[in-house]
């Protein structure tokens, strides 16, 4: 989140706006990658999921994860809670790493989050919690919030608190390719 001093400065600047300009133009097809000219402005439509996948492949050992999914030593259940992380999880976990299609649930982003609340906790992600309590539960369960900056991590019938998950991740990041040189620092918010 932006510091309050920054957001206050932006708000103060909005008070000085005395005009704005409009341009009548056809709608831009955001599903077609490439550039579009809109007046004097060039708009570039990118695939953020593809870019994110490339970054994650640099940070994590995709070969090891893929091998674990293939040989059964790793199984995953991810609940996107009908938020923005769904397409990212489908692309990376299912399409790239080979997890079963049903390993990622509630993956289609919906304006109303499917009638639920995209808060990754035992109350709002109760479907995942119930799934992870089954006798043949996956080895790893996870859910994320509406914009993907908070998560819930679970093992088979085991809940990892947000503060513990941050500590576990920080303590073991050196094992990941993208963090072999160490971690510069971590930050936590009030909930963690």
Whereabouts are the PLM-identified features?
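Gly/Ser/Thr-enriched, mixed-charge loops and adjacent short helices
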Residues: 1-136
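Gly/Ser/Thr-rich loops at beta-strand to alpha-helix junctions
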Residues: 81-87, 148-149, 191-192
């Amino acid at each position: 989140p932006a510091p309050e001093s920054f957001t206050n400065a932006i708000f103060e600047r909005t008070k000085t706006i005395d005009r704005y300009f409009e341009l009548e133009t056809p709608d831009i097809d955001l599903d077609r990658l490439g550039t579009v000219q809109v007046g004097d402005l060039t708009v570039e439509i990118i695939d953020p999921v593809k870019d994110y996948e490339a970054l994650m492949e640099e940070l994590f050992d995709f070969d090891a994860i893929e091998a674990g999914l293939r040989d059964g030593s790793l199984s995953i259940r991810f609940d996107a809670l009908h938020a923005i992380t769904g397409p990212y999880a489908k692309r990376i976990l299912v399409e790239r790493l080979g997890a079963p299609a049903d390993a990622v649930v509630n993956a289609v982003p919906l304006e109303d989050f499917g009638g639920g609340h995209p808060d990754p906790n035992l109350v709002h992600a109760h479907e995942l919690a119930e799934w992870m309590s089954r006798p043949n539960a996956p080895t790893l369960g996870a859910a994320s919030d509406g914009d993907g900056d908070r998560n819930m991590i679970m093992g088979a019938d085991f809940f990892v608190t947000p503060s513990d998950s941050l500590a576990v991740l920080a303590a073991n990041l050196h094992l990941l390719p993208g963090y072999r040189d160490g971690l510069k620092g971590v930050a936590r918010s009030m909930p963690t």
